[in-house]
A protein has these predicted regions:
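The canonical alpha-helical register within tetratricopeptide repeats
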Residues: 50, 90-91, 136, 176, ...
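Glycine-rich, often proline-containing surface loops adjacent to acidic residues and nearby aromatics
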Residues: 26-28, 149-158, 197-200
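Extended non-membrane alpha-helical scaffolds
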Residues: 161-208
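Flexible inter-repeat linkers and adjacent short helices
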Residues: 1-131, 144
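N-terminal low-complexity or simple alpha-helical regulatory segments
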Residues: 77-80, 88-94, 137-163
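Structural signature of alpha-solenoid helical repeat junctions
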Residues: 23, 59, 63, 149, ...
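Residue-level signature for tetratricopeptide repeat
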Residues: 34-35, 54, 72-74, 115, ...
């Protein structure tokens, strides 16, 4: 099964550009690791650099942090180029921070979903918790500036409005999210999710 997974036919229609890039990036990341173990350092650096470019382009935050960490070590030990080392170190710090912020947003999102859907908690309790989380996450959204962070944060914001039956506030928030996410052209599933929410919110407003 492991061997088969390395030879997936990503030319099939089910794979969009981002899915293809995801598979290729992780495959190449593993290949570069193997080259490092075999002391083929320059070849490993070349593959890591190429993969890093794709990981940044398609917003694979965890992978970007991992690749930049490996490159940071390789440039520190092998290349003797302080400019390259500082460039990669900066990318590593930036994406470790993004990774941390995404994890914070995910934890708040999962906690709230547990109250909102699983426990079926009273609306006042959900509204209070959603407001607390949103007010923590929203001001630092630009520091993260990732699609996943925006998704978790704005979904929490929507739950805050829904729990207070505030349709107008929810619609304004969805429109704000879509305005930000339209720049993230490789995250169509998240854009579609908020677009669907926007359409569903227009109907009750139109019937008031």
């Amino acid at each position: 099964m492991i061997n088969i997974s390395l030879f997936v036919d990503i030319s099939q229609p089910m794979f969009n550009d981002r899915a293809k890039a995801y598979y290729n990036c992780y495959r190449d990341f593993a290949s570069a690791h193997i080259l490092t173990l075999r002391d083929a350092i320059q070849a490993a650096i070349d593959i890591f650099e190429q993969t890093l470019e794709q990981a940044v382009k398609y917003e694979f935050v965890d992978l970007t942090a991992d690749i930049s960490r490996e490159l940071r070590k390789l440039y520190g030990r092998a290349s003797g180029d302080p400019v390259k080392h500082e460039r990669i170190s900066k990318i590593h710090r930036e994406y470790e921070k993004k990774k941390h912020l995404e994890m914070l947003a995910l934890e708040h999102y999962e906690s709230l979903i547990n109250y909102y859907i699983v426990k079926r908690s009273p609306s006042k309790e959900v509204h209070k918790l959603a407001s607390q989380y949103f007010e923590e996450l929203y001001p630092i959204a630009k520091e993260a500036n990732t699609s996943q962070y925006y998704y978790y944060t704005y979904t929490i914001g929507l739950i805050r409005h829904f729990s207070a039956n505030d349709t107008i506030g929810a619609l304004k928030l969805v429109e704000e999210a879509l305005e930000i996410l339209k720049e993230k052209k490789y995250q169509q599933s998240i854009i579609i999710c908020f677009g669907t929410s926007k359409d569903s919110l227009y109907y009750p407003i139109a019937t008031i």
